Structure formats: C-alpha cells, structure tokens
From Swiss-Prot:
Its EC number is 5.1.1.7. Pfam families: DAP_epimerase (PF01678). It comes from Listeria monocytogenes serovar 1/2a (strain ATCC BAA-679 / EGD-e). Pathway: Amino-acid biosynthesis; L-lysine biosynthesis via DAP pathway; DL-2,6-diaminopimelate from LL-2,6-diaminopimelate: step 1/1. The lineage of its organism: Bacteria, Bacillati, Bacillota, Bacilli, Bacillales. Substrate binds at N14, N73, G83, N84, N170, N206, E224, R225, G234, T235. It catalyses: (2S,6S)-2,6-diaminopimelate = meso-2,6-diaminopimelate. This is Diaminopimelate epimerase. It is an enzyme of class 5 (isomerase). The gene is dapF.
C-alpha cells in the first residue's frame, strides 16, 4: 500500500489532483500505473468528488525548467497539454521555489509561466504560455481534404457551420455560433462522433462552440477529448481566442476576455519574426484542498482532506460571470 499526498486544484473549475512525484517518491511509476491511479481517484463517485484528471509534477528532463507537468485524464488517457492545469502547476512550482516567473516542461514544449495581477476578489492568478501553435493537418491529425482548415464549411461534419482547426499542441476544432445553436444538441452529437472511431480525426479532437459577446469578449463551451463537456478548457479558450483575433483582424497583443461555465480568463497572442504564434493564458490557479489517499491495486481510499478558503473567493468571480452572461442571452 502506498500513501499519496495531493493538492486538489482548479483552473476555471477545470479540476485536478496535483501529485508531486518526487515528494511522494513515485517517480518510478509506469505510465500504466499513473493511468490506473487517475482512473480510480478521478471517479466522480469517489469520496473526494473525483476530478477531470491528475497533474503529475516531477523533475524536468532539461536543465532550465523548474519542473515538468504530465497530464492524465480521468479515463486514463494522456493529454499533451492542459492550459488550466498548467496555471496551477505554475503556482505550485513557483511557490515551491520562491519565484515569480520561470519555465515549465510539458510533453511538447518548454513554456514560460509567471505570477500575474489578480483577476479580482484576491484570486491567485497566473499567466502561462500556450505553444506551439500549428495549423497543418498532420499536427492534429486531421483528414478533411484540406491541409489547413480555417473558417470553412465541411459538409461531412455539418452542412452549415464553418470550422477552423488548430493544434496548441493538442487538437482543437472551433466554430462560431449563435445562442440557438448553443442551445441545441449539435455540439454534443458532433463531438461524440469525432471522439469515437471516425475517418476525420483519428486521434479525436476537442470541439468548441464559440459565441461572440462583444469586440473584446467571447463565450466558449468545449467538449474535451477523453473527458466530455467540462467547465472550461484552457487550451481551447486560447485556441478560440486566436481564431477570433484572426477572423476579426484584432490586434494580437490586446487581451481578449474569455467567458465559460467555469469563470473568466484573458488571452493575448504574439507573432515572432519567424511568423510563429504563441498565446498567453491568464487565469486563476485555485488550491481547493490538500490531503492524502492510500493506493492499493484495486482501491484508492481517502485518508485526509483539508479545505482551503480559496474556493469561496473564486465563487465570487463565478457569481459575477453568471450575472454577466445572463445579460448576453
């Protein structure tokens, strides 16, 4: 039996158990064991309430970063990137090392992270880099008959909606819709199909429906690959912000307010001299509780769990967001 200590965290109410592999002396765990533990602990019927996944934090394989993040979804699958999760990992590592900015290694890139000005209500807020950004079909992968899909109708997916596809680096399929389409079952039907065996996105894809709220604000709802509908998806909010900026020819560096069922974040973008795009995701990094579980081959049992006051702070922001969104329906 192993005793595993955790921090329950969330970014935009996209919730996770953060597990420090070095602190728990589990750096030798196999990927299969990490997946099994995630499936058991993240079960929504578990006494701890489950989660969308586990953020495994360990030493970086490179010299520069202060740590490495590995994301395992609640179904045991691996996510190449998670923007909401990265904000909480950024906070954990920056506080651990008494820093305000640093680099963190993810599966596909080494990314800049730093502490940011609070979004309000004294909510701990962090800024993380989202990159690399690619549009080519192979990066997703995607098979819809074009090398780059940007604001284009794909009859095989939907007869009316115009889609854009981008990897950041996990794959995203994005369309801008009105409230009527949001209220329909079209998103769930399409996303469920594209995340089962299909010829268009063989590895599945995150599917986001986006509603414009104003020149500097959008609402995003995402069906996440390996998870389903969640309160928010950080990389999706980043990807949708980029597509909005490109469609509307917005200034990349101007912050875009992104609303979702989990709260609100801000996203900026920049393009370097080589033409490469990177995104900056700014949002909460809330520590909900700390605790421990016992892990045996067939069960994960709660041992301790102590709540922090941070969730109450975040709920003030959620209340504000819900009141605002009511005015946009």
């Amino acid at each position: 039996m192993a005793t595993i200590h955790f921090t329950k965290v969330h970014g935009s109410q996209n919730d996770f158990f953060l597990v420090d592999e070095e602190g728990n002396q589990i750096m030798d765990w196999s990927d299969a064991k990490r997946a099994d533990f995630a499936i058991k602990l993240c079960d929504r019927e578990h006494s701890l309430g489950g989660a969308d996944g586990i953020l495994y934090v360990t030493k970086s394989s490179e010299a520069g970063p202060i740590g490495q993040m590995r994301v395992v979804n609640s179904d045991g699958s691996i996510a190449s990137m998670c923007g909401n999760g990265l904000r909480t990992v950024a906070r954990y590592l920056l506080e651990k090392h008494a820093l305000t900015e640093a680099k963190v290694e993810t599966m596909k890139a080494i990314l800049d992270v730093k502490k940011a000005t609070s979004l309000g209500f004294d909510i701990p807020t962090y800024q993380v880099e989202i990159s690399p950004v690619k549009f080519n079909a192979e990066s997703l992968p995607m098979n819809v008959g074009v090398e780059k899909l940007f604001n284009q109708v794909v009859p095989e997916l939907d007869a009316e909606l115009a889609f854009s596809a981008v990897s950041v680096p996990n794959p995203h399929l994005i369309t801008f819709v009105d409230q009527t389409v949001l209220d329909s079952d079209r998103q769930e039907t399409l996303a469920s199909y594209l995340n089962s065996e299909n010829p268009y996105f063989p590895d599945g894809v995150n599917v986001s429906f986006v509603k414009r709220l104003s020149d500097d604000a959008i609402y995003v709802r995402t069906f996440e690959r390996g998870v389903g509908f969640t309160n928010a998806c950080g990389t999706a909010m980043s990807a949708c912000s980029l597509i909005k900026k490109m469609l509307d020819k917005d200034t990349f560096e101007t912050p875009l307010n992104v609303y979702n069922d989990g709260g609100r974040v801000q996203v900026t973008a920049k393009k370097d001299e080589a033409g490469d795009i990177s995104l900056q995701l700014i949002g909460n990094a809330t520590f909900v509780s700390t605790g421990s579980v016992s892990y045996e081959s067939d069960t994960v049992t709660e041992l301790t769990n102590e709540a922090t006051p941070e969730q109450a702070q975040y709920q003030e922001l959620v209340k504000e967001v819900k009141e605002f969104l009511k005015t946009t329906e």
